[in-house]
């Protein structure tokens, strides 16, 4: 038979073990990362998300003493990078991926045969920055306002075209054309640099880009409208879509995400490290130069925003009869 003394000793031992396990959780999290971390970027070198990510990697290296290695995996509208992180790496926090929030939210709506759920399988750790979409035309065209362009397109159905280099811009553009009742020909581009050049050279007559991207095309392009609640400091003459009565045009944000199933201590540690890095003067300066606002929303807020984007774009896709391709 077990004596009361033995029972008490067993209870004490169990309590001590429980406390040691509880203490080990935070300690393990603080020791993470213990080796190099990869940040996968589904954009080419030199593009705004790549530049931002490289600056972020430097700050994370300073904070942890561990290398944060940026790896560009470009292709298939981000699917190459997203599928790699969602399915091919361990859920251990040692691989992250940068994503446009709108890109993840629309991917399942536009792409057939995905082997992962973009919203479920790649939870955001932090929303890094927000930016504007700019609706631009070639500077060689005579239109000075968005409404002047719309009037011209209405008077010439099927004779003008617009472009895009990703599914988000395509979906947003189709929604805009449907709302305004415009008959415009769609021209797809595989690479964003080719698309930007097409706007600058009048190969296409209009299209959405990020604000930072179109800055590189000045003065060969003209911005007629921007997303956001206030006018852009970069293009103050351009009206906001809200001013034009078009309130459903979405803005741009970039998040940093991990594979679903990443242990909570590692997830929380990454969240804290990235939030700390985004608050530094260095990251704020880089963001500003790229025309981006370093909002640094935590994981809970970021997940809610992603779900809202997916819902809103789902409504748009249904309205325009979009089918995955």
Predicted feature locations:
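Bacterial N-terminal signal peptides that target proteins for export
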Residues: 2-17
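C-terminal lobe and pocket-closing loops
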Residues: 212-279, 308-311
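N-terminal (or domain-start) structured segment
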Residues: 29-120, 157-159, 168-169, 178-208, ...
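N-terminal signal peptide c-region/cleavage motif recognized by signal peptidases
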Residues: 20-26
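Structural signal for conserved beta-strand scaffold positions within catalytic alpha/beta enzyme cores
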Residues: 72, 98, 124-127, 164, ...
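Hinge/capping helix and adjacent helix->loop/strand transition within the periplasmic-binding protein
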Residues: 87-94, 109-194, 241, 251-286
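An extracytoplasmic/periplasmic, membrane-proximal ligand-sensing/linker region
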Residues: 34-36, 178-184, 264-325
């Amino acid at each position: 038979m077990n004596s009361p003394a033995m029972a008490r000793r067993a209870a004490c031992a169990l309590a001590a073990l429980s406390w040691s396990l509880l203490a080990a959780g935070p300690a393990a999290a603080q020791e993470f990362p213990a080796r190099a971390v990869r940040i996968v970027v589904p954009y080419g070198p030199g593009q705004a998300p790549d530049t931002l990510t490289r600056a972020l990697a430097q700050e994370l290296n300073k904070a942890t003493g561990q290398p944060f290695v940026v790896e560009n995996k470009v292709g298939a509208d981000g699917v190459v990078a997203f599928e790699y992180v969602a399915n091919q790496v361990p859920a251990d926090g040692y691989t992250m991926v940068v994503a446009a929030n709108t890109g993840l939210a629309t991917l399942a709506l536009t792409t057939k045969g995905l082997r992962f759920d973009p919203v479920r399988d790649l939870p955001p750790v932090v929303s890094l920055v927000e930016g504007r979409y700019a609706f631009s035309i070639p500077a060689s065209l005579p239109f000075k306002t968005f409404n002047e362009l719309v009037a011209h397109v209405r008077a010439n159905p099927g004779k003008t075209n617009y472009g895009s280099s990703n599914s988000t811009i395509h979906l947003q553009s189709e929604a805009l054309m449907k709302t305004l009742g415009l008959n415009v020909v769609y021209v797809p581009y595989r690479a964003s640099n080719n698309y930007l050049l097409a706007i600058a050279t009048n190969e296409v007559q209009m299209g959405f880009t990020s604000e930072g991207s179109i800055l590189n095309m000045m003065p060969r392009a003209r911005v007629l409208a921007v997303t956001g609640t206030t006018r852009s400091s970069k293009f103050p003459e351009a009206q906001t879509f809200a001013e034009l009565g078009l309130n459903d045009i979405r803005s741009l944000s970039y998040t940093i995400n991990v594979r679903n199933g990443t242990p909570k201590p590692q997830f929380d540690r990454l969240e804290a490290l990235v939030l700390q890095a985004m608050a530094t003067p260095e990251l704020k300066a880089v963001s500003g130069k790229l025309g981006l606002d370093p909002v640094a929303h935590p994981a809970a807020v970021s997940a809610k925003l992603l779900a809202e984007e997916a819902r809103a774009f789902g409504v748009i896709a249904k309205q325009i009869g979009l089918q995955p391709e």
